[in-house]
Amino acid sequence: MKLLNRLKVFERKYVFLRWATGAEYGKINYVGDDYVEFNIIDVDTMEFRETTIINASLILEVIFGGADISRIVAEISSMLPEA
């Protein structure tokens, strides 16, 4: 299975993404044929800082589970308005 096919499962999910020139927590917005659109989160304020388009061949690591990801999801969820 190719990396891009696997990443399509994680569209709209929070992950830790490491690529050739950086590593950040964020949300995968879209997985294209040869790139990934990634919203970077400022972990201090839990707000989206910027959107990055990353060439898929430069992606080295994607972490989609664990304590850090759970913490980010919990903090983002706590900031949602009450229904």
Residue ranges and their predicted role:
Residues 1-83:
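Conserved RNA-binding domains used in RNP assembly and mRNA/RNA metabolism
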